[in-house]
Regions:
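Cleavable N-terminal export/targeting peptides
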Residues: 1-19, 332-338
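Outer-membrane beta-barrel "beta-signal"
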Residues: 148, 244, 317-338
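Solvent-exposed loop segments that connect transmembrane elements
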Residues: 71-80, 272-282, 327-338
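Detector for outer-membrane/organellar transmembrane beta-barrel domains
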Residues: 27, 55-56, 186-278, 326
Length: 338
């Protein structure tokens, strides 16, 4: 997965300076969401550990602790409360070569890009995930089994990366997964800073289902603009989302207070092909537009604000959201210099 590749590469590359010291990273945040007039609150923390073992092995895991406070329904006053704590994934990586990493354990399914690249609370520009985030992620978003990933080809003009995985069925409360398999292939063009990829998953238990996806990421050089998009299709629904954000390069860029503002826009639509539901996509055709304005403080602190208008045959709703996120990163102990 993308995070694994980055952390593994960083840990191995910095071995001389840090003697393979485990890193603890993650984020802590506090979020509010007002949906159709009802406001809920959700403080949470997502710690992540990456622990190199020698030159070729890496253990990594991310967990979540979340408290949710929400209005009591049925005209009852006051708030209800829910708590969850558990691992999101826990895996071991064997870096066989620069072209191949072998992953075993509980891993995040690499279908399209949101699940394994953008779902961390310190990375996403908007509090809510896309409406099609459930397509191809087999309910839990993770698998228990093995995965092969790496760079199949790389040059100054283009690079090709791949993931291929198989997951067994697991009914464990913390490591729940479906029997399934799939893969993803992406091509990146460094000169144009463009990435295009395709994904395919197949559920292999109960009713077998196929999922198809494609993604396009583009970051035009020297503009401060980013565009990310996905299309996903399952047996019962399909949809897409397109998200853009912008950080000005004027006024000293991120060193100036104006350069820390980050406007965000996401447009998305979902379409149901039948009334069967096994994918987490809304039960009726839905359109949603999100308008966000984030502020990036120094020292890894972000404020997220957004307004969304959602249209569907069921009803139209307004969604107001705010949040503050702190990203942390530190070694577990001081390494010895060679």
């Amino acid at each position: 997965m993308f995070v694994a590749a980055v952390l593994a590469g960083a840990c191995v590359a910095n071995k001389a300076a840090a003697q393979d010291v485990p890193l603890i990273s993650g984020g802590v945040g506090f979020f509010t969401s007002t949906n159709d007039g009802s406001t809920s609150y959700a403080p949470q923390i997502q710690p992540l550990i990456a622990a190199p073992i020698g030159k070729s092995l890496l253990f990594e895991s991310r967990a979540i602790i979340i408290e949710s406070f929400f209005p009591n329904g049925g005209g009852q006053p006051g708030y209800g409360h829910a708590h969850f704590a558990g691992p999101i994934y826990m895996q071991g990586d064997y870096i066989a070569s620069r072209h191949l990493t072998v992953v075993g354990g509980s891993f995040i399914l690499p279908f399209n890009t949101y699940n394994d690249r953008l779902s961390e609370l310190w990375i996403g520009n908007l509090q809510d995930g896309p409406l099609i985030a459930g397509l191809g992620t087999m309910g839990s978003g993770s698998g228990v089994g093995g995965m092969l990933s790496g760079s199949a080809f790389s040059s100054s003009k283009a690079s090709i990366s791949y993931n291929a995985w198989f997951s067994a069925r697991s009914g464990n409360y913390y490591f729940n997964s479906q029997r399934s398999s799939g893969g993803r292939a992406s091509v990146y063009f460094p000169e144009s800073r463009l990435e295009v990829g395709v994904s395919y998953d197949r559920s292999l238990q109960n009713t077998h289902e196929n999922f198809f996806g494609t993604h396009v990421w583009w970051e035009p050089k020297d503009t401060g603009l980013r565009m990310r998009s996905e299309f996903g299709r399952g047996e019962h629904a399909q949809g897409y989302w397109v998200e853009t954000d912008y950080r000005t390069r004027a006024f000293g860029a991120s060193e100036h207070w104006l350069g820390r503002f980050e406007p965000v826009f996401r447009m998305q639509q979902t379409f149901r092909m039948n009334n069967l539901r096994s994918d987490g996509v809304p039960s009726v055709n839905t359109q949603r537009a999100d308008f966000g304005l984030d502020y990036n403080f120094p020292h890894e602190v972000r404020i997220l604000t957004s307004y969304a208008r959602q249209f569907s045959a069921a009803r139209d709703v307004n969604v107001w959201e705010t949040g503050i996120v702190y990203r942390f990163l530190f070694p577990t102990w001081k390494g010895k210099a060679n």
